[in-house]
């Protein structure tokens, strides 16, 4: 069909957004990308997704069935290493997209350790975490917002590879 539009609804934030379908869309699938300029309009969370399109020889749009989709946080800036202070605390500042909204729960996972952020004002796309009395070592870092973890695998590569989201705590 033509005039394909992807409809996204996030009930928690009472959001309804539309994104033009593009890419290699075909009769059996649709591809779309949230435009970078609009990333903050799509908070991390679960979305109900449908496609609206006009079928050949028809003038009224039809809507597909609805499917679930998750938008995950993406770490955009992470220090390669941080030094612990005299108490064994490591301060880690990160940047990410999309912005954290008021009411969302957030933590930084460092290996098996979950660290809560220092105080912040939402919306924000940067946070500081202090891993208290933490051990030295090279840790895999993930950002968790409302139970959704930032990806650690780059599935655009063949074969898939791990993102280099590690922090060396000294």
Question: Locations of the language-model features?
Answer:
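Short beta-strand elements
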Residues: 59-76, 149-170
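Immunoglobulin-like IPT/TIG beta-sandwich domains and homologous Ig-like subdomains
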Residues: 1-58, 86-149
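Short beta-strand segments of immunoglobulin-like
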Residues: 78-86
